[in-house]
Amino acid sequence: MKINEFIQKYRTVTKLVPGMTSSHTPHVVCNDGFEMSVQAGQSLYSEPREVVDSYEEAEVGFPSTEESLLTSYAENEDNLCGTVYGYVPCTIIDEVIEKHGGIDESKIDIK
């Protein structure tokens, strides 16, 4: 499963006021146990910065272990597991997912 498919399947969107939304996607959990937050939408480090069906770039946050494919996007390179990674190309996110064995949908925490 690619990240855009994951976002479409699991994201929840809440309309706050006309023209403003809040969106949340549960953590991506990979088959080898690697986890990361991947978010896209208004007020997030994504492209586009709207609620759409497909993204070019998304915000990654708080990976469970350091991931070399993400390092150059880190806001804080001194705390790679406790920072946000802005505007990460979805192709890179897909590479990270593939590197870690794909998404384990049985472990997705749907609230």
Language-model features: locations:
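Generic structural motif recognizing short loop/turn segments at the entrances and edges of beta-strands
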Residues: K2-I3, S22-P26, D32-F34, S54-E59, ...
